[in-house]
Amino acid sequence: YNLTKTFHETTFSKKKSADYENYTRQWLRAVKPLLKKTGSIYVCCDWETSLIVGNILSEFFHVRNRITWQREKGRGAKANWKNGMEDIWFATNSDHYVFNLDAVKIRKKVIAPYRVNGKPKDWNETEQGNYRDTCPSNFWDDITIPFWSMAENTAHPTQKSEKLIAKILLASSSQGDLVLDPFLGSGTTSVVAKKLLRHYIGIEMESQYCVWAEQRLEMAKLNPGIQGYINGVFWERNSLAEQNSVHTKSKKDTSASDAQKSLFDFQGEL
């Protein structure tokens, strides 16, 4: 992000634009041969570095889109607009790449349900309410940064949420693929890759963050869930009550199914 910022015991100073361009070009050149032909790369940045990143990215890869992530939280400013957005550049190594659209649909509540001949049109009627599964755009407003009350939260100053990384990995990789994050931080990419049955490699220079990453990977064994992603779909922001309702019903249905299966198995043995 080219900021003057302290990450635990390491302080980075903001570089001049030319120096930041050289730095970005250097690490992208190093990553290029590691990415397979059908692979994709996502680069996060702020508004100030976005043009630099996008231009240099196009030197090595096929730039497909620029995603704008509305983080919700941001520092106020007296003489400027509050910065509550980040850019995420999406690029591929070739014209043949993985993109799983159905894996990243967003479930949205239908405010004014429309029917044709009494039947729902382009939406589903459920016990929890009326919803429509929509294709995501390049404006992501359904993902917040990790707050103190979230189990995934750490003291890392620029931690990405598991929901954000899950959307990227589900769209551009498949189960069993290998995911690389050369700026791992507190381990979110590796944790999400583990939860989504991907292999992972993370690189991080700060030892304390490596410890946090290992702890989170251990916790993922006990809790493989991703907040905001349930039953194969992403949910809107501020819909936790609905998510919990669906999750509880799903667990009950699974328990009932298991009990029924056990009953049939027992009868078959008589």
Where are these regions (language model features)?
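SAM/dcSAM-binding transferase cores
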Residues: 247-270
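S-adenosyl-L-methionine
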Residues: 214-255
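Core catalytic lobe of class I
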Residues: 1-211, 263-270
